[in-house]
Swiss-Prot record:
Predicted to be exported by the Tat system. The position of the signal peptide cleavage has not been experimentally proven. It comes from Cereibacter sphaeroides (strain ATCC 17023 / DSM 158 / JCM 6121 / CCUG 31486 / LMG 2827 / NBRC 12203 / NCIMB 8253 / ATH 2.4.1.). Its main location: periplasm. Na(+) binds at residues 156, 214-215, 240. GO terms for molecular function: metal ion binding; organic acid binding; protein homodimerization activity. Residues 1-26 form the signal peptide. GO terms for cellular component: periplasmic space; tripartite ATP-independent periplasmic transporter complex. Substrate binds at residues 99-100, 156, 177. This is Alpha-keto acid-binding periplasmic protein TakP.
């Protein structure tokens, strides 16, 4: 038998075996129906869609035996209470961001996004190969939660401002919709953090109730129309260098799954995680050009502002580490890898990207 014939027959044989195995698996697989509470509205299709990717993959892999029904923010529980509903068993799972629960325990935020942490590539490396998933779940177990990465936006923008800010002095008295760790850091520089629900941000900006707001990035931000009332779009979002969205599962419900279903669930989470970042990388370039065409003025945060924010963030970290052992354990792990990651990132990746950006700006791409 020649090699080509052997490969063809092997492929056919493998396909036949899979076809025979699939019905057998379907017949023996238990029926599971879960509800997932998303922290996001359906209008933000890329980030909300992460849960739909998970649901679709699980249904297809189990011939419909493992179903996860996805509900948008507010349909079952308020978006910022999704993890609480999982802890209590009101729902089996949620799709949310850990920093929403900063007030419960700042440790929730570490595996999601905190100031001057890792990039999307860096945080993914830490999660999957640096023990990050296990460290986070060790902490979450006290809340009856098991979590896996379920999406990443890439580094976010720094927000929409009604006026320019060029120095730290310009931040004094600035009313900005920003919360959690970032709000605590900015407060030290004179900013007055505001907690405002997503649907109330636009009118607050329009009326001047707030001077600025952070959100996500070009694709999502354009949909909300902030450019119409706040022309200055600053970058980067130093508090969200690689924000991870998580799928959080009720620990008892997760442990009640068969080993096969647990494996399929983790695989689907991983696929949804990768897919979201790919979508944002695909959609943001078009969106940023559209925003600029509509009058948006892009502005980088000045080195003075970034350095001041970095120093203030380190002060907050020191306070957290001194008072919260769980926070310190995870942050120590992230810090150690952050140093290694940026040692490598500044060599090949940074120089390649820098060269290509020069070519782009010269009109050669």
């Amino acid at each position: 038998m020649d090699r080509r014939s052997f490969i063809t027959k092997a492929a056919v044989g493998g396909a036949a075996a899979s076809a025979l195995a699939a019905p057998a698996l379907a017949q023996s697989a238990p029926k599971v129906t879960w509800r997932l509470a998303s922290s996001f509205p359906k209008s933000l299709d890329t980030i909300f869609g992460g849960a739909e990717v998970l649901s679709k993959m699980l249904s297809e892999a189990t011939d419909g035996n493992f179903q996860i029904q996805v509900f948008s923010a507010g349909e079952l529980v308020p978006g910022l209470q999704a993890a609480d509903a999982v802890t209590e068993g009101t729902v089996e799972c949620c799709h949310t961001v850990g920093y929403y629960y900063w007030g419960k325990d700042p440790t929730f935020a570490l595996a999601a996004a905190v100031p001057f942490s890792l990039s999307a590539r860096g945080i993914n490396a830490w999660h999957y190969h640096g023990g990050g998933i296990d460290l986070y779940n060790e902490f979450l177990s006290q809340h009856n939660i098991v979590a896996f990465p379920g999406g990443n936006t890439g580094v976010q923008m720094g927000g929409w401002f009604r006026r320019e800010i060029n120095t730290v002095a310009d931040m004094q008295g600035l009313k900005m919709r920003v919360g959690g760790f970032a709000g605590k850091v900015m407060e030290r520089l004179g900013v007055v953090p505001q907690q405002i629900a997503g649907g109330d941000i636009y009118p607050a900006l329009e009326k001047g109730t707030i001077d600025a707001t952070e959100w996500v990035g070009p694709y999502d931000d354009e949909k909300l129309g902030f450019f119409k009332v706040a022309p200055y779009y600053y970058y980067p979002g130093w508090w969200e260098g690689g924000p991870t969205v998580h799928f959080m599962f009720n620990k008892s419900a997760y442990e009640g799954l068969t080993p096969t279903y647990q494996s399929l669930l983790r695989t689907a989470c991983h696929a949804a995680d990768a897919n979201m970042l790919q979508l944002y990388d695909w959609k943001n370039p078009t969106a940023i050009k559209s925003l600029v065409a509509q009058g948006t003025q892009l502005r980088p945060f000045s080195p003075e502002i970034l350095q001041a924010c970095f120093e203030a963030a380190n002060e907050v970290y020191a306070e957290m580490e001194a008072s919260n052992p769980a926070f310190k354990k995870i942050w120590d792990s992230i810090k150690a890898f952050r140093s290694e990651h940026y040692t490598w990132a500044q060599i090949a990746e940074y120089n390649y990207d820098t060269f290509m950006m020069v070519q782009q700006n010269a009109g050669k791409l």
